[in-house]
Amino acid sequence: MDKEKSDPSCKSSDLKISNISIQVVSVPGKLPGRRPPRKPIGKPRPRKQPKKRAPFWNVQNKIILFTVFLFILAVTAWTLLWLYISKTESKDAFYFVGMFRITNIEFLPEYRQKESREFLSMAKTVQQVVNLVYTTSAFSKFYKQSVVADVSSNNKGGLLVHFWIVFVMPHAKGHIFCEECVAAILKDSIQTSIINRTSVGSLQGLAVDMDSVVLNAGLRSDYSSAVGSDNGCSRYLYADHLTLRYPLEISATSGQLMCHFKLVAIVGYLIRLSIESIQLEADNCITDSLTVYDSLLPIRSAILYRICEPTRTLMSFVSTNNLMLVILKSPYVRRLAGIRAYFEVIPEQKCESTILVKEINSFEGKISSPYYPSYYPPKCKCTWTFQTSLSTLGIALKFYNYSITKKSAKGCEHGWWEINEHMYCGSYMDHETIFRVPSPLVHIQLQCSSRLSDKPLLVEYGGYNISQPCPAGSFRCSSGLCVPQAQRCDGVNDCFDESDELFCVTVKPACNSSSFRQHGPLVCDGFRDCEDGQDEQNCTRSIPCTSRTFKCGNDICFRKQNAQCDGIVDCPDGSDEEGCGCSRSSSFLHRIVGGSDSQEGTWPWQVSLHFVGSAYCGASVISREWLLSAAHCFHGNRLSDPTPWTAHLGMYVQGNAKFISPVRRIVVHEYYNSQTFDYDIALLQLSIAWPETLKQLIQPICIPPAGQKVRSGEKCWVTGWGRRHEADSKGSPVLQQAEVELIDQTVCVSTYGIITSRMLCAGVMSGKSDACKGDSGGPLSCRRKSDGKWILTGIVSWGHGCGRPNFPGVYTRVSSFVPWIHKYVPSLL
């Protein structure tokens, strides 16, 4: 019992005799169903040990886990950085400035005080309305806020609300914010009545005049000035006396000058701003400017005028309402910046009258543009009716510095005229013209430009004999003027348009006549017209000064024409050769006719003008910091900005310039006409003057004397990187040159018809050589025989195609603009 208890492997239920069986076999026998075990042949196999499991945190796994961790960390950091950048740097604010008129609310004087309860309440109401308009629009997720800056009276009644709208959105989506789109949302929200046929509609309960809604893109700097707390140079000036002149003066000699003057007059009157002098840094309004607005906020479409350079000439501007904004900007005052001006309250004027004309072949009265002598405001309108006393008389209108021509499909830049149901365009010029209407009853309507204020117009009127416009013995010019018949074909441009010198029969001059020797236009002109050469003798002998003589610095005059900078000292004081360092030498050795490659260094005054990095126009060096080019290269808001322009000097192959300078300033002639290409000339001032060390590679070309005469058939050269053929898609990489000859002006006028005295033609009538697209603004260089210097005779302007037979190129005649050039570049005198 004890033994059983001591052995736990034994159990009492298993110990039964019946469960035991014994089988006895003999030794040599085999157990049934068993194979004898195999004896091992070799060494006994070692017993297999159980495999140990490797620990998880071994070196290899640690490296893998660490790599995965670093990858996750890098992805997370990059994602966070991307989110941060997208929230900070990639979002831009877009500012819009505008105004509209509320017709059903009367103006309160308290609205002038921005801290008053009345102003704050009205501003809150308008802001809530604007917020509702844009938060329910397609731009809702980008809309940030609206700010009412001013609430003013106006001459049409009600309130004029000036406001800002701000959007914030990713930079990549900024292109969807078109000015027209944002304005359309506001205008479309105004519900107008078709039945009442009125422009006044409901804008969330506000009665808004749809015609008054103006909305333009604005500048962040203007927004900050309008709504910011720092208004150190901002003034609100209210004028309520008709006889007073309110002074407007401010100046600074250093620091910055950023001033806003808000001018408001009593209801029913206008504001006239008169500027006596202004000091600015002339740079095309890039930094310094004085801008006059027909509003109380800087709304681009409400600009009346912009001044970009200093002036001491009295200028005055008139508003179209009882308010005006004047902004003076000069962020980096170097010497002096400021304005001296005054403003006054004036009544509105009606520009209409009926006039009875009595005189024949004389001018008996004057009409003028509105508010003369002020610049007349945009969108003004004048009507005049003229009636003559006789049916045989017509009406003659004499314009000063102005001309009207038939309206073309391009429209009119300076307003349009309707005269007896015929449409005309007006343009400014530097001489007078006469326009005749062959009718005893004349209805005239002037519709002013819708963009900016324009220069004042003064027009004389009178009657004339329809059957004989000019008196007997007179020649009728294309400009409408009448000149004595004796002045026809005398070599002098008496008509101002050269029409008296066209279609002249060339006759051999009467060299022996006293009148020819004393007053002949061919005398002392540098060309030998008489066989014995007497027309070119005694040309520097002192004579009394006239309009046809050359005047020295010591007031001595002589008959020699084109004496300035001709390489010969003619004046006793040497003043005729002062400042004549142009075209001192030339490496011109070989000429290739027909638009072939030039030689490097041949044309050291040639310039390539690049716009946004690409070659666009040509120009000529006339001094160390001034270039001369064509006005049409810079026509339009985008091209007139000097910022994207660079000048490449001393260049033979495109991309290999010896000197490159940004353009600081572009001066386009004030009379440039984009429809006719008249006055197609512009000056460019470099930001950096080219160094004297490059004078062997860069040289100025000589400016011709004022009124220089040229002879047809004279050989000259046109150069540039323009297209070699009209069908080419791009310009030449190598500077091209082509020999051309000056074409007779009569042939030029016969070919094109619209040639003015400020143009000349040059080319080869076969069409073999000509300028083409890309050459515009480049030089037409002619070599003077007397001293071998190169003269800038013309500037590539326009033409009919390129190299077409019988259609020569048209060039700006530089000699017609010498006084204008000297106005900006006096060092050339």
From Swiss-Prot:
Q: Which residues are glycosylated?
A: N401, N465
- State its location(s): Cell membrane
What are the residue boundaries of the CUB domain, all occurrences included? 233-346, 351-467
Residue intervals on the Cytoplasmic side: 1-62
Q: List the disulfide bonds.
A: C233-C259, C285-C308, C351-C382, C470-C482, C477-C495, C489-C504, C511-C530, C524-C539, C545-C557, C552-C571, C565-C580, C617-C633, C716-C782, C748-C761, C772-C802
Q: Which PROSITE patterns match?
A: CUB, LDLRA_1, LDLRA_2, SEA, TRYPSIN_DOM, TRYPSIN_HIS, TRYPSIN_SER
Domain SEA, residue spans: 92-220
Q: Which residues cross the membrane?
A: 63-83
The GO terms this record gives for MF are: serine-type endopeptidase activity; serine-type peptidase activity
Post-translational modification as stated in the protein's UniProt record: N-glycosylated.
Record-linked Gene3D superfamilies:
Low-density Lipoprotein Receptor (4.10.400.10), SEA domain (3.30.70.960), Spermadhesin, CUB domain (2.60.120.290), Trypsin-like serine proteases (2.40.10.10)
All copies of domain Peptidase S1, residue ranges: 592-826
Assembly, in brief, is:
Forms a heterodimer with SERPINA5.
Q: What does this protein do?
A: Serine protease which preferentially hydrolyzes peptides with Arg at the P1 position.
Would you tell me the protein name for this molecule? Answer: Transmembrane protease serine 7
